[in-house]
Design a protein with these regions (language model features):
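Noncatalytic linker/hinge segments flanking ATPase motor cores
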Residues: 40, 103, 112, 116-120, ...
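Short linear loop/turn motifs
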Residues: 99-114, 147-150, 277, 313, ...
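Alpha-helical structural motif
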Residues: 77, 125-129, 165, 255-258, ...
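Active-site cores that bind ATP or allylic diphosphates and position pyrophosphate for catalysis
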Residues: 147-288, 295-300, 352-364
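N-terminal Rossmann-like or analogous alpha/beta NTP/dinucleotide-binding catalytic cores
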Residues: 2-157, 250-251, 255-268
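Short, surface-exposed acidic
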Residues: 93-95, 270-273, 319-326
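Short secondary-structure transition/capping segments
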Residues: 114-131, 157-160, 185-195, 316-330
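Non-catalytic terminal extensions that flank enzyme cores
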Residues: 1-38, 56, 61, 177-179, ...
Length: 364
């Protein structure tokens, strides 16, 4: 299989699973946890709905560990995530520990044609792709610090993945770049974003249309510390793994036009996207790592059954009229992605809050 467009010649022998057309079945979906911590209920919510979307369509499910940041990811978190997914009744066909064997130490065995399935083992692939894009003039070095970006863009929160960027370094001359490097400035790599609108049909939210300017302008593909950015790693892995369906939280909605831009530059067919509502605590805030006291691992330790968690999540998603315990597989027969709520879901909406969930259910 020839890798198209800007991807480097060295990748042409890389294992590439071509995505079928949108009308082809079965679908290929993915679970893509990142291991900077243990799984919380918000993660479980997203993984359950993504799993149901693939399995209800008779599709193939890939588990990909998004551990690209070495400073935040730890092997014990990756093993715990796999254990918790299994405990919740979620399985997969490709990736680590397909057979359920999770060693206490060392690497988990992988199964499938598109590995490696840990992003940390795919760094050479990302670097080769960036080198090819650099040679093609698609990227440029940016020497701006976060402080400078805040001052330039008036943005209170700036990060490498999606800060509003005014294009300060886009047209620097070679001499201006040398001057910055001589002062010890380290550069990230940014995409020269194409103009125009990116349209896509979201499986839950309907027709979507963005310009990349709407999403912050030229975005980083590699951070100044050398770590590849989320947008590049995810888009490239989805393409090379033949992913045709991506179900994820609506907080990542504006990542989609960025990933569509990359896929278009590389010549890949994009997957179908569906952005699901977020799960909120009783104060109306998104469940996140600060809620680890009520993470899946802690709930297991307290004796809460997986079926109880699935039952509550099913009720919140509108998949069941009550919260009776049940297995994830029990939801498959009647699951329809388009029936999920469009608005974020608050735990306080439950008609009767289980005791184990009460700490998260202060009034919104």
């Amino acid at each position: 299989m020839t890798i198209p467009c800007a991807l480097p010649r060295s990748l042409q022998g890389y294992r590439y699973h071509p995505a079928p057309s949108a009308s082809s079945r079965p679908v290929r979906g993915r679970l893509a946890p990142s291991p900077p911590g243990y799984m919380h209920l918000g993660n479980a919510w997203a993984f359950l709905l993504a799993w149901l979307a693939v399995r209800s369509a008779g599709g193939t499910l890939v588990l990909r560990m998004e551990d690209i940041d070495p400073q935040r990811s730890r092997p014990e978190y990756a093993r715990a995530l796999v254990e918790d997914l299994r405990w919740l009744g979620l399985d997969w066909d490709e990736g680590p520990a397909v057979d359920g064997a999770i060693p206490d130490e060392g690497d988990m065995a992988e199964q499938g044609p598109c590995g490696p399935y840990f992003q940390s083992a795919r760094a050479a692939l990302y670097d080769a792709t960036l080198d090819a894009m650099d040679r093609a003039g698609l990227v440029y070095p940016c020497y701006c610090t976060r402080k400078e970006l805040r001052q330039l863009a008036g943005a209170p929160h700036v990060d490498d993945a999606g800060a509003p960027y005014p294009g300060t370094c886009r047209h620097l001359s070679p001499e201006e770049r040398r001057q910055r490097e001589a002062r010890g400035r380290r550069a990230c790599l940014r995409l020269r974003c194409p103009e125009g609108r990116f349209h896509f049909q979201d499986g839950l939210l309907g027709e979507q249309s963005f310009t990349l300017e709407d999403c912050g302008g030229d975005f980083a593909l590699r951070r100044s510390d050398g770590v590849v950015a989320y947008q590049l790693a995810v888009a490239l892995d989805d393409a090379l793994m033949g992913i045709t369906q991506v179900v994820r939280g609506r907080d990542i909605l504006t990542s989609t036009p960025r990933q569509l831009a990359l896929l278009r530059l590389w010549g890949f067919e994009p997957p179908a996207y569906a952005h699901i509502p977020l799960l909120l605590d009783g104060q109306g805030e998104r469940l996140a790592k600060r809620h680890q006291s009520l993470g899946v691992r802690e709930l297991r330790r307290q004796g809460v059954a997986a079926a109880e968690i699935v039952g509550v999540l099913a009720r919140l998603a509108g998949l069941r009229p009550d919260m009776r315990p049940l297995a994830a597989a029990d939801l498959l027969a009647d699951f329809r992605l388009e029936r999920l709520p469009r608005q974020d879901v608050c735990l306080r909406d439950l008609p009767c809050v289980p005791d184990w969930l009460r700490p998260l259910c202060l009034p919104c």
